[in-house]
Amino acid sequence: MGLRNLLDKVEHHFEKGGRYEKWYPLYEAVDTFLYRPGSVTRTTAHVRDGIDLKRMMIIVWLCTFPAMFFGMYNVGHQANLIFAQSPDLLGAQDGWRFALIGALAGFDPNSLWDCLVQGAAYFLPVYLTTFIVGGFWEVLFATIRRHEVNEGFFVTSVLFALTLPPSVPLWQVALGISFGVVLGKEVFGGTGKNFLNPALVGRAFLFFAYPAQMSGDAVWTSVDGFAGATSLSLAAAGGVDNILGHGLTWMDAFLGHMQGSMGETSTLAIFIGGAVLLLTRIASWRIVAGVMLGMIAMSYLFNAIGSTSNPMFAMPWYWHLVTGGFAFGMIFMATDPVSASMTDTGKWLFGALIGVMVMLIRVVNPAFPEGMMLAILFANLFAPLIDHFVVQANIKRRLARNG
């Protein structure tokens, strides 16, 4: 018996009046994940594109793969570089992860396999925890409300996991995604009704609730007893010269050969996935362009103002592009169609607001060198207001034109 036949055979048990009626959302989630939805229109439909929510979310999920796999490689590569430079640290490591890594691979920084295995030993448990805990809340709320489980959580789960440092405790991962899904989305009605990006809500909660595990110099590698600063922290401490002084070139930063959150280091990998999102029109090019233009304009403004005490004023825009979570946030977070502005003009303004805000936070705030997360959440709050004024301006313009 094929899987399709098996699902069809048990379907009546989950429908209204069936033995497992209350579990229909779970059945529907499995069925639509494995096969296309069976619902059809009852009357003539005017379809511009056959894409549905399921296909859209799966495309976004697949577009994170370049950043995901490079992130796993880079986590392992950074750790193995440290072990090669300080062999004594290798003997000080313990735990189930290192037992697993030792059984499946080695600690050679020049071995692709060794680096991937080490990175996977840190990323996959984080992703699995995110998926299981967040999925539990999705299914619970869908069951209570008696509606289908949406595929949007596939995207939320992977984006949340990719924004975390490799050393984050798994219980904090569970707590963060619970906060993001429940208070960032479900309390407002679920998929399509949230005004904040749930992945960023969860990440912001962890940042403010557990700053010791989300920031500083000791959280960006998987090596216990080692502290290493991110490129953005180096820039905040001494500008671009400080970054270059630590042996990190712009090309290294662009390719992602540096410490940072698991999925945010490689601008190249992020742009590969972003190109697909833009070509398929899932992501709005207006938002991406607005973020870039806002960031570049503010960067030139700060460069012109200058500062003798704050080296971030002199940092060029192309360094801001490849440091921190700017590229990841611009491509995957800012373009969330639910929490972003919906009008064309509003998308430009929404993106520009993010670009301006991230520069203000990075440059002017000495205690917080990264600003993309807060900039996007700030813009999410203003997205409805931006659309309101754009619509009102359009109404006034049409009234003036047509009398």
Swiss-Prot record:
Its cofactor is FMN. GO terms for molecular function: FMN binding; oxidoreductase activity, acting on NAD(P)H, quinone or similar compound as acceptor. Signal peptide: none annotated. GO terms for cellular component: plasma membrane. InterPro entries: NqrB, NqrB/RnfD. It is found in: Cell inner membrane. Keywords: Cell inner membrane, Cell membrane, Flavoprotein, FMN, Ion transport, Membrane, NAD, Phosphoprotein, Sodium, Sodium transport, Translocase, Transmembrane, Transmembrane helix, Transport, Ubiquinone. It is a multi-pass membrane protein. The chain crosses the membrane at residues 56-76, 121-141, 164-184, 225-245, 260-280, 287-307, 312-332, 348-368, 371-391. Its EC number is 7.2.1.1. One of its GO terms (biological process) is sodium ion transport. The keyword Translocase applies. Pfam families: NQR2_RnfD_RnfE (PF03116). The modification FMN phosphoryl threonine is found at T230. NCBIfam families: nqrB, PRK05349.1. Composed of six subunits; NqrA, NqrB, NqrC, NqrD, NqrE and NqrF. NQR complex catalyzes the reduction of ubiquinone-1 to ubiquinol by two successive reactions, coupled with the transport of Na(+) ions from the cytoplasm to the periplasm. NqrA to NqrE are probably involved in the second step, the conversion of ubisemiquinone to ubiquinol. This is Na(+)-translocating NADH-quinone reductase subunit B. It comes from Pseudomonas paraeruginosa (strain DSM 24068 / PA7) (Pseudomonas aeruginosa (strain PA7)).
